[in-house]
Amino acid sequence: DYGNGMPDGQQGWKQASKNFKIAGIRTSTSVTNTNLTITYRLQETNSKYHVSYTLYPSGMIHVACHLETQPDAPELPRIGVRFRVPTDVNQLEYFGRGPEENYCDRNNGTLIGYYKSTAEQQYVPYVRPQENGHKTETRWLALTDKNGEGLLFIADSNFMEFNVSRNRIEAVSYTHLT
């Protein structure tokens, strides 16, 4: 990413991810579900990001995201959702490519299967702090505490990708000695 100048060319998206503002909220309720849609304005890229949560009586929540960009918006390498869970929710099980980290452009050496790990085991101490522990072609992911209580994520169609980290990338310091 540094070789092609991505950190410089993508600053608008990075700033937008830190400064998004709520532009609107819509709710609706039916006999079968309740829907909450939040629209965020990303000022730096003149874009809108819509996140829709549909809640079902079973406890299931369906999350759908949609990004509206302008034709002159900077290139966007990918888009996703990050969220925090309690620190004791550190157990992970998934069905996808693993067990090593892998990305869509370099995942042929990892096999599709069922894997178990922890958030701590996903950490890779790269010299320059960066995303790590990424997994591709995931069908489902369970994040739980040691008692097995937590969240289950199921890909709607195709697959999903994920990584689990104890810290935000921006909060990690360099690990090399000076």
Residue ranges with predicted function:
Residues D1-L177:
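Beta-strand/loop-rich accessory regions of lumenal/periplasmic or secreted enzymes
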